[in-house]
Amino acid sequence: DKVERNMKAFIAAGGRARWDYLIFEHSECDVERAEQLAKEWGVERFMKKKTGRFINANSEKKETHQAKNRKGADMQQLAKPKKAEHQNLALLKQEEITKTYGSMMDYYNQATVKCKVAGKDTKSIFITAEGLVMPCCWTAGRMYKWWHSDPKVEQIWDFIDAAGGKDGISAKVNGIEGVFASGIMKDIQRSWAFNSIKEGKLGVCAQKCGTEFDPYAEQFK
């Protein structure tokens, strides 16, 4: 009820609302009803979003996704939608990628990276709650994974440390231009030419912006 009231109030005040409807097994029966409500309320855009969550941290397919809260406790278990029209096509392509390259890791090692935030028409940066400047939410999101007792086991910290640690990429300490001067953005971009993740290619870039496997983009098709 609160969400509905807030959305209606936002639209009534002149807001341009967009509703991204994540489709899981438990919610796919309500897609048409939600789309009708969006029209009735004056939502500018209703997106049937085909989630790409059904890949684990090792890039293996899974049929369910266990949602957890910020303390790591299990919440609702999410399952793939049943209807093919609601499924993310990139997940279906995963078998083809594996046959071609041998494994998803072999694909990531060889993947051509086309950055989603440094393209010709789209340029953006991501500033974390700590005031740290990163290329995107995906690179920033690798900094603190709740399942690591030591967050610095993640590869992204190699680039952060090379830039002077957290202070080196802090907008509060250096300003945004100063963070760019630290070299972290160029170092990440240069890494895409390396032969493998083991040799220094930033893996999260290959996973999220590799040109042949893109669950993110397929969510919106």
Features from the language model and the residues they span:
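Radical SAM enzyme [4Fe-4S]-AdoMet core and its adjacent flexible, acidic
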Residues: D1-A171
